């Protein structure tokens, strides 16, 4: 249910302990200009035809209660809610599939006929009380194939006696609450025939642009103790615009960028103050259509194909370890910066800071807010005119106006406020701005000014009818398929000619399994009785309940994943379920196959700018209906030709419509300036502490080995800086006989001594670069400098990189002690085991955050390598990478000789870091079906506007999360879609757009919502929310909220869905692992209490949670345990002519360990091999290379390569695990009864420790809270 803009609904609470929640964001997006029209007032949804809506989907069940007021609960327990249609509706309903070709009918042809989609006043919003609104999302996944999850058989061995796991009163003090790249080279220039090539380069450098939904964020009421899901605000000197009236505030919400707030007695006001910061980027246009299949070994094979006219290029790229990269293009003073729509802020929030970052929202920010954006009324209209001047499909025509901001490049507007239709003639494009007079990008843009929205013309205005002569090759109508657009009567006389995805709607009824009592995911599980809850095989992502053909077309969960694979119809239904709603994304991951499309035309919706995808509906050959805003768009002439089949007139068979993940080679329309070269700057700590650690030797050797593998082209540039108490620059200009060191000792006023010779061409100055790398490790051997001027060194790096942008790699070994950004030690070693307050999780100064935002504005990302044995205040230093879209690498107790395992890890990590794909000047936007909105983002980036994430760099190891809310009822549609678009510049200088599209069903039954829970995605989203809560509130609040997430969801299930005995702790099969994963999260370094944890270690764990993809994060939260002393070939898999054993998973409990065995624990970044005291000597000799248990050394970090079957199996299995992750894990071999085993046993999360519950005790605690 949606509430009127600006209205507030205080959330009711079921218990006093904190709940997860988030500031919801509502509103529509900004208009794109007169060239786009509003959505049709008719049945919404890609699959919605004039069909009877089955029970369970689309319509409320007769017992379904949709309260019109606020949802509240009693103070002591969960309110018993009426039972929805339960499991029967999960399979009994028909999901109407998006129709690629729908035969129109004559509905609503009479004058004055009522439109099916007239929007009445929104119903009041229902705010959940216990968990709060789990509104958010992120997507990231770990498996290349979306296969249906197989029901795992649980070995039900009931506990003989609860006394074995009795929870004593002493546990109350344990921290738990006692109460609750390819180039499409055509053989001829501007050839009319596309060339088909099959190069072997991996599909690297494919980062695209991702843009969030156009809905304006509205802050929802949250409890004092709920996860607010806010983003950090940053202050700026200039004041915010005055608060508009409530009426104007509602009007502004339609623009998609106004900030709405709520207030509730006793609750602090909260806001999502989303600000824009415009910078530029550019792409190389490729007008020569080609089809390329790239692979990393073979050369291109050109093959001419003869189409009737010039056509787009589609290429499938096989990605390998190293992909093609490309240069990025930051803004320059010669290129304009696009204005943005305004952000309106209420007066009560004027004390908040004005910059949002996708990780933390800090409501205690300074009281001088200033949005980082520059806009005016005139500029906003100019932006709208620019978008209106672009056709429904972006083309490379020189008549297109030159966009002057990323927001204008990608486009972002919702159909409600658009004034003209897709088929009406586009207005003349706005004159191209003069680059010479364009303003330079500013790091701190001017305040935003409210802009009144424009009136929209009626939907369908100006659409011409279909030409009567277009009836060739008519096909018989498909029975049962009704038109999805009854308003358009102009082409109703023409039959359907081409089948498509939409035709599947007539067969979706086959999904009904009414003969089955319930799906496996809804099978009730008694958690306290079912002891072996963990399956023996890995947990796969659940497959959405869609037609088989739609499942094949859907996006891989490795790239795009939702916490709920069945989307609730209303926010009230989501509140009842007490589950988080959000997306997890891994948008730039390495792909083995990626369709790369080079075309003069990138087909996009004129209203919401969605890229055409497999879930759109083709009304006829000339029109397609957007699956996000339901706007009808024209099909461009070029799109009629399919280069793969060499056929004409079948747009629904184009690769863009057959693949949910595609990459476009973008035209000049997506550029703000020419692509810049790839620029790499290394800033190195050379103080005494750094020289003593010995990292310079490893770094310089790795650079020498991988210098030729750095992503880039012939223009690639590189530079070096070192620092201690002074800053050292290195002149590597071609022509010098040796490198020249230039020392700047005035760290209070840093300047560049020779700006033109500090960043040099990699290939022209390669010999000088090699000389420097060979000399650096020994240059500072006898240094006595103990101080570190990191802040001034970063200021100098910013000045050096500003003209082009690029990547700065910073290596730091101690606490900064001189100049700007100096820090003091804040850690008290005596408080590392505290069960009470954990302090200093946030930064001590805003210096690094402000500098990071300046870097982001100049398209520069900062990656931090922290190699320190002492406290270095990572909480403060990490801001440099968080807000500039960089990465953080942490090597505690690093020493070249004393800690060889860390030294080896650094060497392997550097090889991956230096050679992996990279994208420059990236922006990312996520769009979603109308009615859904995004309100909180998690990851390393800067939020430039309400839905546009600025990524100075993008890499294949970065993950993101987004929280979602349901702003409007989804009763008019049976499917919802999400689309992420990542626009970036490859290291080869190509502008590319990688697009992922995910389709999910909508359900109206609470049982169906539970049936579609993706428990791993949910726990990863909760982990991101808990990090925010730890920083903005306290660690104890975050822990309480995690516990309440379990209590509330299981309580809601028991009171609304489950009909079994209420004395037992019941959960649906889809949620049976939820309590286990939450307990594992509570025992993770980021959130554990009562166990000695260094502050930097805790902060680094939180940074990993916020930036890792789901597949790697889950291993960090819940490690995998295998027995490896009995490996066999049974069930083994074959990988590259290698047989890899697949041992079953073991529960993380000491009861599974035997002294006669050996066990491998995979914790993501570290492997442990625990060897029992009575382990078979044959295994010890054949695998470890020692005669018996006693002869195994205390510190062993390698498995020897022995010519035995057992050794081959063990090494093959460990190598297979290592190959599945980007960074190399450290291997520790731990002997039973050795001191090192304590670290291993800390990961046995099902066992009790001095400061935490066992799994069974935790279940009893949850059950006790539910029964209160």
Swiss-Prot record:
Annotated membrane topology: Peripheral membrane protein
A Pfam family this chain is assigned to: zf-Sec23_Sec24
Signal peptide (UniProt feature, chain positions): none
Acidic residues compositional bias, start-end: 376-389
Annotated segments matching region Disordered: 1-71, 216-263, 303-345, 362-451
Residues reported in the UniProt entry to bind Zn(2+): 605, 608, 626, 629
Aminoacyl-tRNA synthetase among keywords: no
Modified residues (Phosphoserine): 1224
Main location: membrane
Transmembrane intervals: none
Bias kind Polar residues: ranges: 225-234
Molecular-function GO term, any one: zinc ion binding
Region (Zinc finger-like): 605-629
UniProt subunit comment: COPII is composed of at least five proteins: the Sec23/24 complex, the Sec13/31 complex and SAR1. Interacts with STING1; promoting STING1 translocation to COPII vesicles in a STEEP1-dependent manner. Interacts with RNF139. Interacts with TMED2 and TMED10. Interacts with CNIH4.
Record-given protein name: Protein transport protein Sec24B
Organism: Homo sapiens
Gene name per UniProt: SEC24B
């Amino acid at each position: 249910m949606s509430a009127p803009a600006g209205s507030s609904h205080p959330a009711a609470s079921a218990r006093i302990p904190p709940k997860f929640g988030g500031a919801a964001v509502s509103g529509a997006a900004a208009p794109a200009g007169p060239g786009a029209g509003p959505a049709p007032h008719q049945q919404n949804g890609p699959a919605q035809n004039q069909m009877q809506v089955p029970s369970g989907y689309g319509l409320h069940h007769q017992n379904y209660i949709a309260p019109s007021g606020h949802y509240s609960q009693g103070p002591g327990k969960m309110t018993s809610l009426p039972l929805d249609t339960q499991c029967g509706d999960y399979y009994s309903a028909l999901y109407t599939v998006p129709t690629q070709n729908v035969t129109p009918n004559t509905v609503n042809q009479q004058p004055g006929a009522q439109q099916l989609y007239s929007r009445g006043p929104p119903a009041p919003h229902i705010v959940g009380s216990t968990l709060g609104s789990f509104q958010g999302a992120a997507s990231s996944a770990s498996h290349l194939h979306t296969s249906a999850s197989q029901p795992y058989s649980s070995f039900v061995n009931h506990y003989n006696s609860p006394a074995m796991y009795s929870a004593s009163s002493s546990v109350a003090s344990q921290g738990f609450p006692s109460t609750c790249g390819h180039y499409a080279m055509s053989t001829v220039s501007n050839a009319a025939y596309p060339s088909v090539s099959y190069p072997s380069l991996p599909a690297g450098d494919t980062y695209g642009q991702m843009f969030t939904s156009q809905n304006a964020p509205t802050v929802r009421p949250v409890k004092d103790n709920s996860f607010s899901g806010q983003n950090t605000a940053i202050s700026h000197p200039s004041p915010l615009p005055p608060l508009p009236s409530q009426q104007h505030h509602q009007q502004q919400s339609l623009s998609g960028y106004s900030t709405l707030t709520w207030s509730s007695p006793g609750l602090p006001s909260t806001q999502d103050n989303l600000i824009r910061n415009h910078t530029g980027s550019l792409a190389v246009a490729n007008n020569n259509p080609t089809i390329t299949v790239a692979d990393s070994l073979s050369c291109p094979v050109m093959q001419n194909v003869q189409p009737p006219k010039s056509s787009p290029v589609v290429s499938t790229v096989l990605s390998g370890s190293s992909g093609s990269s490309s240069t990025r293009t930051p803004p320059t003073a010669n290129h304009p910066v696009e204005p943005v729509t305004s952000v309106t802020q209420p007066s009560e929030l004027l004390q908040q800071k004005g910059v949002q970052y996708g990780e933390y929202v800090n409501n205690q920010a300074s009281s001088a807010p200033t949005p980082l954006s520059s806009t005016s009324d005139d500029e906003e209209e100019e932006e709208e005119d620019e978008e209106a001047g672009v056709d429904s499909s972006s083309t490379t025509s020189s008549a297109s106006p030159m966009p002057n901001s990323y927001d204008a490049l990608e486009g972002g507007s919702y159909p409600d406020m658009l004034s003209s239709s897709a088929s009406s003639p586009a207005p003349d494009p706005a004159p191209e701005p003069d680059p010479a007079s364009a303003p330079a990008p500013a790091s701190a843009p001017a305040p935003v000014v409210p802009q009144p929205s424009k009136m929209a013309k009626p939907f369908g205005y100006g659409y011409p009818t279909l030409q009567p002569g277009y009836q060739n090759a008519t096909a018989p109508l498909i029975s049962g398929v009704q038109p999805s657009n009854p308003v358009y009567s102009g082409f109703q006389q023409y039959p359907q000619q081409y089948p498509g995805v939409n035709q599947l709607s007539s067969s979706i009824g086959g999904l009904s399994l009414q003969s089955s009592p319930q799906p496996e995911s809804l099978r009730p599980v008694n958690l306290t009785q079912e002891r072996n809850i963990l399956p023996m095989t890995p947990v796969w992502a659940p497959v959405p309940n869609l037609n088989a053909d739609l499942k094949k077309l859907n996006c891989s969960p490795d790239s795009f994943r939702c916490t709920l694979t069945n989307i609730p119809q209303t926010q009230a239904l989501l509140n009842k379920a007490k589950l988080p709603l959000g997306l997890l994304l891994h948008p730039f991951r390495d792909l083995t196959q990626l369709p790369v499309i080079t075309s003069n035309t990138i087909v996009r919706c004129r209203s919401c700018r969605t890229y055409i995808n497999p879930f759109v509906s083709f009304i006829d050959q000339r029109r397609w209906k957007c699956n996000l805003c339901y706007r009808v768009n024209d099909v461009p002439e070029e799109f009629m030709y399919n280069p793969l089949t060499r056929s004409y007139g079948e747009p629904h068979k184009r690769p863009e419509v057959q693949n949910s993940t595609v990459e476009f080679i973008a035209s000049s329309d997506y550029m703000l300036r020419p692509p810049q070269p790839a620029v790499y700057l290394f800033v190195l700590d050379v103080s005494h502490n750094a020289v003593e650690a010995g990292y310079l030797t490893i770094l310089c050797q790795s650079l020498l080995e991988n210098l030729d593998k750095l992503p880039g082209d012939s223009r690639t540039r590189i530079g070096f800086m070192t620092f201690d108490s002074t800053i050292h620059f290195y002149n590597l200009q071609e022509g010098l006989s040796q490198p020249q060191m230039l020392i700047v000792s005035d760290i209070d006023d840093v300047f560049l001594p020779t700006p033109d010779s500090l960043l040099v061409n990699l290939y022209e100055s390669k010999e000088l670069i090699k000389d420097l790398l060979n000399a650096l490790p020994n240059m500072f051997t006898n240094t006595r400098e103990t101080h570190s001027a990191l802040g001034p060194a970063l200021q100098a790096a910013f000045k050096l990189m500003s003209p082009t942008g690029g990547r700065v790699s910073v290596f730091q070994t101690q606490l900064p002690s001189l100049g700007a950004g100096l820090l003091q030690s804040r850690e008290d070693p005596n408080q590392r085991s505290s069960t009470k307050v954990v302090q200093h999780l946030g930064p001590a100064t805003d210096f690094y955050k402000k500098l990071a935002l300046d870097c982001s504005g100049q398209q520069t990302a900062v990656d931090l390598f922290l190699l320190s044995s002492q406290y270095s205040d990572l909480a403060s230093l990490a801001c440099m990478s968080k807000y500039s879209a960089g990465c953080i690498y942490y090597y505690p107790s690093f020493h070249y000789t004393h800690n060889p395992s860390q030294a080896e890890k650094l060497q392997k990590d550097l090889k991956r870091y230096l050679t992996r794909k990279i994208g420059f000047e990236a922006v990312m936007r996520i769009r979603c079906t109308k009615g859904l909105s995004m309100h909180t983002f998690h990851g390393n980036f800067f939020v430039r506007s309400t839905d546009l994430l600025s990524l100075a760099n993008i890499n294949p190891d970065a993950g993101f999360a987004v929280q979602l809310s349901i702003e409007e009822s989804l009763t008019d549609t049976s499917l919802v879609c999400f689309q992420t678009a990542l626009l970036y510049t490859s290291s080869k200088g190509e502008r590319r757009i990688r697009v992922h599209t995910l389709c999910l069903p909508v359900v109206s039954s609470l049982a169906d919502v539970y049936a579609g829970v993706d428990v791993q995605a949910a726990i990863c989203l909760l982990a991101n929310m808990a990090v925010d809560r730890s920083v903005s509130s306290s660690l104890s609040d975050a822990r309480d909220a995690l516990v309440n997430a379990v209590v509330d969801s299981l309580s809601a299930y028991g009171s609304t869905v489950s009909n079994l005995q209420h004395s037992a702790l019941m959960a649906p099969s889809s949620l049976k692992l939820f309590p286990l994963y939450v307990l594992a999260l509570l025992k993770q370094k980021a959130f554990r209490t009562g166990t000695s944890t260094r502050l930097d270690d805790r902060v680094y764990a939180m940074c990993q949670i916020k930036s890792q993809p789901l597949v790697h994060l889950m291993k960090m939260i819940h490690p995998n345990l295998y027995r490896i002393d009995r490996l066999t070939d049974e069930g083994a898999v074959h990988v590259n002519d290698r047989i890899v054993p697949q041992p079953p998973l073991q529960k993380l409990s000491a009861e599974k360990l035997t002294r006669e065995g050996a066990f491998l624990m995979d914790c993501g970044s570290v492997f442990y091999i625990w060897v029992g005291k009575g382990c078979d000597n044959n295994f010890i000799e054949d695998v470890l290379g020692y005669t018996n248990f006693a002869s195994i050394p205390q510190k062993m970090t390698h498995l020897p390569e022995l010519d035995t079957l057992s050794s081959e199996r063990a090494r093959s299995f460990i190598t297979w695990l290592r190959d599945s992750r980007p960074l190399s894990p450290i291997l520790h071999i731990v002997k039973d009864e050795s001191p090192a085993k304590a670290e291993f046993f800390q990961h046995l999360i099902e066992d009790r420790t001095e400061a935490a519950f066992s799994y069974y005790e935790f279940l009893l605690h949850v059950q006790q809270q539910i029964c209160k």
